[in-house]
Each structure stands twice: as structure tokens, then as C-alpha cells.
From Swiss-Prot:
Record bears the keyword Transport: yes
Protein name according to UniProt: Mitochondrial import inner membrane translocase subunit TIM14
Recorded name of the encoding gene: DNAJC19
Family classification: Belongs to the TIM14 family.
Residue intervals annotated with topology Mitochondrial intermembrane: 2-3
Phylogenetic classification of the source organism: Eukaryota, Metazoa, Chordata, Craniata, Vertebrata
Length: 116
């Protein structure tokens, strides 16, 4: 029993010393870490998604952005993009019904204007 208490005490002390060492090492590394973060391009953190909501009336450009295709894409590409996105965001599998409606609206708009 006494040896267990001593072992636990030594383990806690070792963890404390290790934590103290890590904190001191971090203080010395702080300028280097700041320099690395400043040298990274700003676009790395800006996100690769469209910043903005939906237009009240969907445009051809917005529909193309939603499906991730060119505004002049043919029906085959539009259908493939629609299928891929709906598999990821179907309401029956936890996706948003609103987003699914917008995806369907985008497909309908682009297919109405697309070539066969």
C-alpha cells in the first residue's frame, strides 16, 4: 500500500516537471511559431467556399455555383453533379431539406437552359 502511494506521488511529480518543461519550451518557441503563421498565405485560411446566401430568384450563375459546374454545362454533367451532391445531402440521410430544394431548383434551372 505504501509503495503504491509513493509510486503515484512520483508519477504526479514527474508529470508536473514535464509540464513545466513543456511550458518553458513553448515560451522560447513562440516567436518562431508566430513567424511561421505569418508566412503562411492568407488564402490558406479564408476557406474555399462561396461566401454569401441564396438570391431571392435563382440565377444561372448561382445554379452553376451550387452544382459546381459551368453555366454552359451539358445535361449529362448537370445530372452527374446533381446526383453526386444529392447523395451527400439527401434529407432522408440527415441532409437539409432547404439545401436539397435549392439543389433541385439549380438542376431544373440549368437543365431547362442546357443542350442535350
Amino acid at each position: 500500500m505504501a509503495s503504491t502511494v509513493v509510486a503515484v506521488g512520483l508519477t504526479i511529480a514527474a508529470a508536473g516537471f514535464a509540464g513545466r518543461y513543456v511550458l518553458q519550451a513553448m515560451k522560447h518557441m513562440e516567436p518562431q511559431v508566430k513567424q511561421v503563421f505569418q508566412s503562411l498565405p492568407k488564402s490558406a485560411f479564408s476557406g474555399g467556399y462561396y461566401r454569401g446566401g441564396f438570391e431571392p430568384k435563382m440565377t444561372k450563375r448561382e445554379a452553376a455555383l451550387i452544382l459546381g459546374v459551368s453555366p454552359t454545362a451539358n445535361k449529362g454533367k448537370i445530372r452527374d453533379a446533381h446526383r453526386r451532391i444529392m447523395l451527400l445531402n439527401h434529407p432522408d440521410k440527415g441532409g437539409s431539406p432547404y439545401i436539397a430544394a435549392k439543389i433541385n431548383e439549380a438542376k431544373d434551372l440549368l437543365e431547362g437552359q442546357a443542350k442535350k
